């Protein structure tokens, strides 16, 4: 079985990793400030002196799949002569298992004379707080107590469950590679494999990968399986990859778009959900645009887009949706006196969605009460919600028997019934 090219051509040093200069400098500065590292390495890469870098107990690298988060840590360990203790948080999830694997890795003596050890928790956003018993707590405890560098990676670091990790970690975003940078890497691989690849074909692979170098390399290996020539016609016959974008990437593309059509094009991505986008845009505009006039203009365009959405829902004239998207995407992006935006913007998770998540169980139990009353009183749920529920609430405050009977009928504790009513 052939070696996967993503492993065969994985960068072995910091200098081989392209387009991540800021992330490399921050990570190197953190290592050199808090731990031991070769002087030559620190002199070359440790350029940052930020207070938050010195105080961070761990580093959380984030970004879309395939841009080099894990590779960056591998290259760091090799460059400074550290042994890498690595585990994927999506595979090793329970607290006990995490402590066993990492604890054993830290206790065992190195056979190859490494200068130290570095722990990598890959894909920590794959943890599920309820199902994965103690996993997050175990990672937090290791960060607090371990005397070795700990690095975490995530595709989506702003998941609410990861807030405890964000609070004690230095959050570092990695950028997608540009089309030209991906093409250059693919050219080197073609040359190394002795394959004749048309530049237009490689550019097509790079374009459809949307900066996901791993995906582009995998595609190249697939196309060149059993052959030594790649043409643009080969790509056209097979069709192009359709990338999936997270909401954080969608927001980043909208706010950082250089022109109107670039922001508008985000809506053509298959993962774009305009209803979700409106919720996120409403809460992220003040984070991105600090100037009141710029912020006001962005909100004005978003509100006008929302008016079009309202008309669409009332009249079912869906052709008007395109006008809403023009305002909500291009309009919000291309505001007058738009400031120069930093490479990394810390988008907050919408409070509305957080509140809905927290109240989900209460809303489910209320729905159980409403359905029970509607079924037994032979009325609609709408009538129960509008009138009967409030009458029942008043009765329950005066007579505990009402609460007890409902609790028995629904299998819910009387305390929960009281809270619902």
Curated annotation (Swiss-Prot):
It comes from the Archaea. CDD domains: AAA, HLD_clamp_RFC. Keywords: ATP-binding, DNA replication, Nucleotide-binding. Part of the RFC clamp loader complex which loads the PCNA sliding clamp onto DNA. Belongs to the activator 1 small subunits family. RfcL subfamily. PANTHER family: CHROMOSOME TRANSMISSION FIDELITY FACTOR 18, REPLICATION FACTOR C SUBUNIT 1. This is Replication factor C large subunit. It comes from Pyrobaculum calidifontis (strain DSM 21063 / JCM 11548 / VA1).
